[in-house]
A protein has these predicted regions:
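Conserved small/polar residues in nucleotide/adenosyl-binding loops
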Residues: 119-127
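Conserved functional hotspots at enzyme active or ligand-binding sites that engage polyanionic ligands
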Residues: 1-118
């Protein structure tokens, strides 16, 4: 079956096996890869998503989703947990992030990769 994946889609995925602190098991993931790659590559770049609890700490590499996008629990996209997986690991479509969420994901991703510093994220834009 041919499935068309889009940047910003959320799917359930089987991330097992994981080693050490890698996210593993069946969990939601956010597709980060560009749509050209999504169309032609057998692999796909994702970020793991986890549910949050009252004890969860806030990290600058986390983006909180609350209960948007078809997720049943308040959740966090962990942009320090990026990996390339085979498309066969993707199971069920859950939802899609809106433009505003994806713009914030992009900023958080740039921070996680060290391309944009945390200081720049908190400074107002100057024209």
């Amino acid at each position: 079956m041919f499935e068309k994946f889009h940047r910003g889609d959320i799917y359930s995925a089987d991330l097992s096996p994981g080693i050490g602190s890698e996210q593993s098991g069946s969990r939601p993931v956010l597709i980060l890869q560009n749509n050209v790659g999504n169309c032609f590559s057998p692999t796909i770049i994702i970020a793991a998503i986890t549910s949050v609890s009252k004890k969860s700490r806030k990290f600058p590499t986390h983006y909180h989703l609350n209960d948007r996008c078809g997720l049943v629990k308040p959740s966090v996209v962990m942009l320090e947990q990026i990996r390339t997986i085979d498309k066969s690991r993707l199971k069920n479509y859950i939802g899609h992030l809106n433009k505003d969420d994806m713009e914030n994901i992009n900023k958080t991703l740039l921070c996680s990769l060290g391309i944009l510093s945390l200081i720049h994220l908190s400074e107002p834009t100057r024209h």
